[in-house]
Amino acid sequence: VGITGTTIKEIFMFNIKTAMFNLFFKFDLVSDLPGRMRLKVAHYKKLPKETQQYQQYGIQVIKRLDGIDKVTFNFVTGTVLIEYDKYKLTSSEILAYLDLIKKLVNDNMGLIRNLDGKSEKEIVDILFSVLDAYRSKHDFK
């Protein structure tokens, strides 16, 4: 236990989550059909296997954008399939939203680090509140 009461396991878990965010947001658009886009995660082979248990949060974050129907992570091929309502969204809007999420994470690393001691649910609620505020500020529905 360190000075702040943080255990090695907690630091390890935070580093896994941080690695997932930082590596996930380096992607290429490999397929772009109306209503369906596929992204290739650039460094997916470097993601620790433990990150797979957090994919539900990535899905929830992406699906907060109105018009996203389904998000599927494929950890074998390193792709993310996003199915969306082509009458509500364009792939450019989705990519802009993903950039907004990346900015949110990078701008709030201090906040994320200071969530030590909170339950997983509390952390998710806080981060989703911050995301919703960012979305409002940047005119995302």
Residue ranges and their predicted role:
Residues 84-89:
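Helix N-cap motif at beta-to-alpha junctions
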Residues 12-19, 49-65:
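Short amphipathic alpha-helix segments
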Residues 36-39, 46, 58-79, 83:
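Short acidic amphipathic segments
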Residues 2-9:
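Long, charge-rich, low-complexity intrinsically disordered regions
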